[in-house]
């Protein structure tokens, strides 16, 4: 299932690129410095754009018991740029979290940097939408890997990015180049796509992202579905745990038609699920994920050997704003701090 370009193909690709492309990209540390994630991991999204008015990764880990985080988001400095910052902010360069990540690793944790996100995907500052130079996009990805010392990259593709066919192709071409570079340097790189979903599975444009990955020889380790914000009509309460299972099951069927050489078990292991604790962005408040839903999803993930669970986002994992929908800093339901992380954290191992 997980194919990589051979070094011969890599050399051919690099010869076809302009001077100053991948050949000039970041130099990796020893391969021994790159530690793969656990086979099953809970890695909630951490909203970097709340900095500096949010606890650090290390402080959050110490308070919550969480050890793995998905950092949202790396974005182009501005539309048309080929350089990356956290949240397109010049005050948050790529190495902004270096010391914090080192402290987190001392606790036994690690991070997954995530590219894109709704605001970048909507505004054109997702790096593959913004930059038209595939070799430079790949160099950016490689710099993230070497600067942060990570082994998994997450690509959150939604909004306008789902329909940007040129950006989709560039992203997957750059991923393929980066995978070949990582393989040549002994780095166990994993690629994760995070995509919006309905209970019937991925929309056609989400499927197209993955079909492009296959066409461009970009190996995808994980497909992470955003199991929230369905905007289901009506006011009846939606069972969000079962809705997530429905979405994951439907996605499994779709993946079988895209990754045609993979077994059913391998396809389940490709899947990941993101929940949104409490009230999601649908303002009527009938899409509410509670702790029972979270436990339902954990049991399903364990039974099917899914590779990752996460939430949007760890800063929301508290009951500080009961009744409020779509907050960045609280779930909107009555709960203790870290209830969702305590429930989902049992999945790691």
Predicted regions, residues:
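Noncatalytic modules at the cell exterior or secretory-pathway interfaces
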Residues: 69, 308-309
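A structural signal for short secondary-structure junctions
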Residues: 265-267, 303-304
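Short, low-complexity, polybasic intrinsically disordered segments
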Residues: 286-308
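Chitinase-like catalytic core of GlcNAc-active glycosidases
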Residues: 32-225, 229-258, 266-272, 276-292, ...
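Residues that scaffold, gate, or flank divalent-cation-dependent active/transport sites
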Residues: 313
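Secretory targeting and sorting signals
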Residues: 1-31
């Amino acid at each position: 299932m997980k194919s990589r370009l051979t070094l011969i193909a890599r050399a051919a690709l690099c010869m076809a690129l302009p001077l100053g492309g991948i050949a000039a990209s970041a130099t990796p540390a020893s391969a021994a410095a790159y530690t793969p994630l656990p086979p099953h991991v809970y890695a909630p999204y951490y909203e970097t754009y709340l900095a500096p008015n949010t606890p650090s990764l290390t402080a959050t880990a110490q308070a919550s018991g969480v050890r793995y985080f998905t950092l949202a988001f790396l974005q182009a400095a501005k539309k048309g740029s080929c350089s990356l910052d956290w949240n397109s902010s010049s005050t948050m360069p790529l190495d902004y979290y270096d010391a914090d990540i080192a402290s987190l690793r001392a606790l036994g944790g690690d991070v997954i940097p995530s590219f894109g996100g709704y605001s970048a995907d909507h505004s054109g500052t997702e790096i593959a939408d913004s930059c038209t130079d595939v070799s430079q996009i790949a160099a950016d990805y490689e710099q993230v890997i070497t600067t942060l010392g990570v082994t998994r990259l997450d690509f959150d593709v939604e909004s306008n990015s789902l329909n940007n066919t040129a950006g989709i192709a560039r992203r997957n071409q750059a991923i393929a180049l980066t995978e070949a570079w990582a393989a040549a340097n002994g780095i166990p790189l994993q690629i994760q796509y995070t995509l919006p979903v309905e209970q019937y599975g991925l929309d056609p444009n989400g499927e197209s992202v993955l079909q492009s990955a296959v066409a461009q020889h970009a190996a995808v380790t994980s497909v992470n579905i955003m199991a929230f914000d369905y905007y289901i009509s009506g006011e009846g309460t939606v069972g969000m745990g079962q809705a997530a299972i429905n979405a994951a099951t439907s996605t499994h069927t779709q993946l079988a038609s895209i990754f045609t050489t993979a077994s059913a078990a391998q396809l389940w292991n490709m899947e990941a699920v993101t929940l949104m604790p409490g009230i999601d962005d649908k303002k009527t408040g009938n899409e509410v994920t509670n702790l029972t839903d979270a436990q339902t999803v954990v049991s399903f993930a364990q039974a099917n050997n899914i590779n990752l669970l996460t939430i949007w986002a760890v800063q929301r994992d508290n009951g500080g704003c009961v009744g409020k929908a779509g907050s960045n800093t609280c779930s909107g339901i009555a709960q203790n701090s870290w209830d969702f992380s305590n429930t989902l954290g049992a999945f790691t191992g």
